[in-house]
Amino acid sequence: MSNAITMGIFWHLIGAASAACFYAPFKKVKKWSWETMWSVGGIVSWIILPWAISALLLPDFWAYYSSFSLSTLLPVFLFGAMWGIGNINYGLTMRYLGMSMGIGIAIGITLIVGTLMTPIINGNFDVLINTEGGRMTLLGVLVALIGVGIVTRAGQLKERKMGIKAEEFNLKKGLVLAVMCGIFSAGMSFAMNAAKPMHEAAAALGVDPLYVALPSYVVIMGGGAIINLGFCFIRLAKVKDLSLKADFSLAKPLIIHNVLLSALGGLMWYLQFFFYAWGHARIPAQYDYISWMLHMSFYVLCGGIVGLVLKEWNNTGRRPVTVLSLGCVVIIVAANIVGIGMAN
């Protein structure tokens, strides 16, 4: 396995670790509605950071974006909006299926769709079937799915042991939402594929290869921001128990506390895709769709590890922790199989 591929896998791991930890600051926000908290964090992660970093990277910010036709920008934006819809469905999936089953189904579907649909759309799927390296990467995707399934099973054992149930368990509704979440969340993978002309243009301007994907986030995350912020603002305006004015009428120290924690959560959320871009840049071009598989499987891996570190698995017994550990090992094996496949 080449050093470039190894570093690509490593940066995807770092990005996934940030994704697994980003909600920790949000949990310490006090007396704010979820909608206000999510909006503040989202403004930081989807608008301020992508724009600020792109302004630093690009020699002429406005000239860069105005150089693209609508036919180039629109698919990137719409796939970003598609991914934003997946974000909204993610929370609803947890509500009706519970954390473990919801995450397992949603992540499993988005891993498959986001990884395999890209080469199909690009007409390169035959390379996966007809080459040794392609078959190895497909095997890695399958092993990753098995690992996600094992971690999901560990979560179910944990929830059963601790007596945790879904907020409003509804299998039929939950499965529909999980499938929708999985499909729509893959929009980020499709957006990155559609944004290749933007990456190439950034490279032509002398932007470091590690950073060429970052300017496209202005458009991708702009699409996601409209969906997420629109959802939050509509609820803040329509739901009687929610009030943006009330949330910002608290004591000034508490408002500052909440804003800073929400902004930190937004920063950590953004960093997952900052390092995703670094990892994506190191993956061989013919296997760039594997970035999504690495990100999603490492997200599950890091989520399990973070749970152990935070002692969320204490008092659950030996079996759930053993199953979780097995699932984490399988995901690590999957990443190595994919790495070997790309090297071939």
Swiss-Prot record:
Keyword Signal: no
Subcellular location per the Swiss-Prot or TrEMBL entry: Cell inner membrane
Topology with respect to the bilayer: Multi-pass membrane protein
A GO CC term attached to the entry: plasma membrane
Residue stretches spanning the membrane: 4-24, 38-58, 68-88, 101-121, 137-157, 175-195, 214-234, 259-279, 290-310, 323-343
Record's keyword terms, sorted: Cell inner membrane, Cell membrane, Membrane, Sugar transport, Symport, Transmembrane, Transmembrane helix, Transport
GO MF annotations in UniProt: rhamnose transmembrane transporter activity; symporter activity
Principal location listed in the UniProt entry: membrane
Family the UniProt entry places it in: Belongs to the L-rhamnose transporter (TC 2.A.7.6) family.
Task of the protein: Uptake of L-rhamnose across the cytoplasmic membrane with the concomitant transport of protons into the cell (symport system).
Record-linked HAMAP family: RhaT
Protein name: L-rhamnose-proton symporter
Designated gene of the protein: rhaT
